Amino acid sequence: MTIQQVLLLLLLWMWLLHPCRTEMLFRRTPDLRPKGFVGRTSGSDGKALHRQKRGWMWNQFFLLEEYTGSDYQYVGKLHSDQDKGDGSLKYILSGDGAGTLFIIDEKTGDIHATRRIDREEKAFYTLRAQAINRRTLRPVEPESEFVIKIHDINDNEPTFPEEIYTASVPEMSVVGTSVVQVTATDADDPSYGNSARIIYSILQGQPYFSVEPETGIIRTALPNMNRENREQYQVVIQAKDMGGQMGGLSGTTTVNITLTDVNDNPPRFPQSTIHLRIPESSPVGTPIGSIKATDADTGKNAEVEYRIIDGDGTDMFDIVTQRDTQEGIITVRKPLDYETRRLYTLKVEAENTHVDPRFYYLGPFKDTTIVKISVEDVDEPPVFSRSSYLFEVHEDIELGTIIGTVMARDPDSASSPIRFSLDRHTDLDRIFNIHSGNGSIYTSKPLDREISQWHNLSVIAAEINNLKDTTRVPVYVRILDVNDNAPQFAVFYDTFVCENARAGQLIQTISAVDKDDPLGGQKFFFSLAAVNPNFTVQDNEDNTARILTRRNGFSRHEISTYLLPVVISDNDYPIQSSTGTLTIRVCACDSRGNMQSCNAEALLLPAGLSTGALIAILLCIIILLVIVVLFAALKRQRKKEPLILSKEDIRDNIVSYNDEGGGEEDTQAFDIGTLRNPAAIEDKKLRRDIIPETLFVPRRTPSAPDNTDVRDFINQRLKEHDSDPSAPPYDSLATYAYEGNDSIAESLSSLESGTTEGDQNYDYLREWGPRFNKLAEMYGGGESDKDAS
């Protein structure tokens, strides 16, 4: 028997079973009912199935939802035993939907549904029925309550709350690992038939995932799914009611599943050998290059730690891991030298920092590579034999004495001669010099420890073939002390002796200082240059001495001052000594030795003024002198009224000739005769508001006879101003309206141009600005001139 035949038989059986199911649907269950009512039920075709007699249950009617017929759907029939069939009774219906959703025939008691009913909106309706006498309107039967229950049909498909689900599961998970659970709901009645019984199935996503039919739990179906091969999966789940049988309704949803990463891949170097280059002049800490091991994992599972585990350059280089790029940066640890070593080999290891113990069986999660670093030769500057030099020299050495030698060499393979020099910024007084060839430092000026005990020099070494690459080294010169300074009095002593002093009386304690600094400390000796009958010196042997009197009584009227030479010597080699003169005044003292007066003519001197009084007197004198000088200057100043108050004419030199007298000989204006002096004529005048870029040498031009020079001079100035209208006027204006003797410059009639003023139009001068207003008034008189004439 074929599948088609089986399906045909199944359909035939279901068709034959349908009327029986309908009849059972409307069958009433036995129950007590109000006396006198008889209920009739009908099938889907509206025909009466049977008549229920008294004692049968009639208070439940059953109605299929979603009726699609054109007529009202028949629900059932109410009938009373009091009904004779003559129309004397009237059936009344009240309750849920009465009169709108459900109507009753008043004469026959037939109940109909006026529209299609959805069980999902309401599953049952409670109504009340009553039979009354049509004429008296009195009930013939007590009111009875009944229920119309809506029978469900499979008219709702299962639905998922989410249209798209997102889930994740670790890669390499075992078969059956739960991923996510999806749940669908069906609005049909779960207590009636299989309309709400849902079965889940997978439409897309096999063979990677499966779903449990009853629960909707999605599980992995394949072992060792690798994220590195495929990361995203889309699974379509179907939910079907009727227990998944044919004819059931279904709904679908999409589940996007992502495989999350686990550390199942070790790091791998793409190359077994990596070559890097670095110049030998690179300082410590310079990055040489980066290496990177690739890891197919992501996130913390791909984090790698780099380290140098072997090689001949483990002490010369370091490697640092950069977390953001997961690269290993190799840096210089110690200075490199091409001439010492040119190639280094390192063995670098990369290892995962987070290892999952579940995947130890996949092998060690680390890898190694060989890094070869080539040192490149560069033209290095000279290298000194020391990082600094310290020379000690006595301050009394002769000029030109060598105090020390610095040494430097060219570290390159092709060694070049070295040239030495001193940085003069460190030896401004030029006390030292250096031999440029051998680096010997010698003195060029005398040394003095007392002026400067240390000299900090900077020596520069450069290759003769390449003077740009230089190296500096500090040289510290310490000046050693020699005993070249004699001791002196520590301070100036104002010593006096009382007239009533006695022999052996202490009048002064003296001490000395020495600029030298001997190793054993300073020791001074005090003595008198010659035996003195009045005073003596007693050495205290602690670098101090006492001045004592040798006799009784002194008179300031006889001798007011004594000079006592004291010899001070040191104990260093060679011994230095000096003689200091101590001035001792004779003073009058009281009985306790307090000085009262030290000058014999003190009583004859007038009382002196204090310092403050003297300063006040001087200030008064200065103020009086200043006032007198200012008054004299103001008296001599003459106030001159300007002829022209225009701000634009501040550069003009205007002289007024309105006095009567000898004519131009009495004026202070410049002599026009100088225009005929060839020495005073310049080829070109510079504008005053422009700073000349170059200096022009005056050029002499041959003088022209008569008035040609004046004409050429004026034409030249006019040409300059015509070609540069923005320049201020350079020439000075003077009016020559003289009476008296003839001018030594002869007649000015030669300055007259070939045309009259009427032929010229100088109105454009007014458009050049306020600086040319005066010229516009001179040359462009216009109507004012005509009116004046």
From Swiss-Prot:
Span of domain Cadherin: 55-160, 161-269, 270-384, 385-487, 488-606
A GO term for molecular function: beta-catenin binding
Transmembrane segments annotated in the record for this chain: 607-634
Proregion span(s): 23-54
Parts forming coiled coils: none
GO process annotations (BP): adherens junction organization; calcium-dependent cell-cell adhesion via plasma membrane cell adhesion molecules; cell migration; cell morphogenesis; cell-cell adhesion mediated by cadherin; cell-cell junction assembly; homophilic cell adhesion via plasma membrane adhesion molecules; synaptic membrane adhesion
Topology of this chain in the membrane: Single-pass type I membrane protein
Protein keywords: Calcium, Cell adhesion, Cell membrane, Cleavage on pair of basic residues, Glycoprotein, Membrane, Metal-binding, Repeat, Signal, Transmembrane, Transmembrane helix
GO cellular component: adherens junction; catenin complex; glutamatergic synapse
UniProt cross-references to PROSITE patterns, sorted A to Z: CADHERIN_1, CADHERIN_2
Top-level taxon of origin: Eukaryota
Glycosylation sites: N256, N438, N456, N534
Compartments, record wording: Cell membrane
Domain notes: Three calcium ions are usually bound at the interface of each cadherin domain and rigidify the connections, imparting a strong curvature to the full-length ectodomain.
Protein name: Cadherin-10
Gene label: CDH10
